[in-house]
C-alpha cells in the first residue's frame, strides 16, 4: 500500500480485526454485485469506499425518477441513463483506485457462471426469484459465498450462504423455487432507509468474509422490522432434499 492508501483506509486499519493484512485482502478482492438499485447502491458504495479492489456490477435497467427516493448511487441528472453507468461514475469519484466493471445486462447462463466463478464473494441485490435462484445455483456449483438481501415495505432481511463450508444451507433451502414471485418495490412500496440498512449489512458481511473476521450470518437469517425496530435472527438448516445443494 502507498501512503495515500494508508491514510484513506487508516480508520479501518487501526481496527485490530482488520489491520494491514485485512486491508490488503480487501484491496486484492474481487466482488460481484447483481443489481444496482436500492440494495446494490449502498452495498457498492461502501465496498468501494472500503477499498475492495475490483467490483463487477450487473444491471439491465435505466435510472427512473421513482428510483431516486432510495437508490442513492443515482441522481436527478442520471435519469434515463443506464444504472450501471451512473453507479460506476459514483464509485470512481468515491475511490478512483477501485476497478469497476459495469455491465448493462441481465446476468444469466454461461456469463453468470463465469462471473460467479471469478468472484470471491457475490452480493445478490435483485428483486425477483428467477434471478435469485439462478445466482444461488451458480454459487453452489462454484462454492462461492453468497450474501443475499431483500427489502420491502418497512422490512428487511439478510442471509449469508457459504456452499461447501460448515454444512451451510443455500437460498433454495430457505425458499422453494415453486413459491410465489417475490414482492417488489414497484408493486408494494418501500421506505427509503431500509434499503440502505440492508445494503450496508450486505457490504459488511462481504467484507467480513473477505478478511476472514468475526462471525458471519452463515446459517442465519437476520430480519428487521423497522416500524418497531425489532431485530430477529432465525437459524437456517441445510435441507438434505434441496433440489440445488442437496444434489450437487
Language-model features: locations:
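Adenine nucleotide-associated cytosolic modules
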Residues: 1-248
Amino acid at each position: 500500500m502507498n501512503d495515500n492508501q494508508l491514510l484513506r483506509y487508516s480508520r479501518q486499519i487501526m481496527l485490530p480485526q482488520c489491520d494491514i493484512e485485512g486491508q490488503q485482502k480487501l484491496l486484492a478482492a474481487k466482488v460481484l454485485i447483481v443489481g444496482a438499485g436500492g440494495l446494490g447502491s449502498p452495498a457498492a458504495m461502501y465496498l468501494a469506499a472500503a477499498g475492495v479492489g475490483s467490483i463487477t456490477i450487473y444491471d439491465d435497467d435505466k435510472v427512473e425518477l421513482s428510483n431516486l427516493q432510495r437508490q442513492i448511487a443515482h441522481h436527478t441528472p442520471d435519469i434515463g441513463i443506464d444504472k450501471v453507468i451512473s453507479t460506476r461514475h459514483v464509485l470512481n469519484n468515491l475511490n478512483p483506485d477501485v476497478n469497476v466493471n459495469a455491465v448493462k445486462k441481465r446476468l444469466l447462463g454461461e456469463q453468470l457462471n463465469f462471473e460467479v466463478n471469478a468472484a470471491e464473494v457475490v452480493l445478490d441485490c435483485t428483486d425477483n426469484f428467477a434471478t435469485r435462484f439462478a445466482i444461488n445455483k451458480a454459487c453452489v456449483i462454484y462454492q462461492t459465498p453468497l450474501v443475499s438481501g431483500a427489502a420491502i415495505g418497512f422490512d428487511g432481511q439478510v442471509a449469508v450462504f457459504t456452499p461447501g463450508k460448515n454444512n451451510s444451507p443455500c437460498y433454495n433451502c430457505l425458499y422453494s423455487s415453486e413459491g410465489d414471485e417475490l414482492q417488489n418495490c414497484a408493486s408494494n412500496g418501500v421506505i427509503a432507509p431500509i434499503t440502505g440498512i440492508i445494503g450496508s449489512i450486505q457490504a459488511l458481511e462481504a467484507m467480513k468474509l473477505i478478511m476472514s473476521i468475526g462471525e458471519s450470518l452463515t446459517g442465519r437469517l437476520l430480519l428487521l422490522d423497522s416500524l418497531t425496530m425489532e431485530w430477529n435472527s432465525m437459524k437456517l438448516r441445510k435441507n438434505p432434499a434441496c433440489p440445488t445443494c442437496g444434489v450437487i
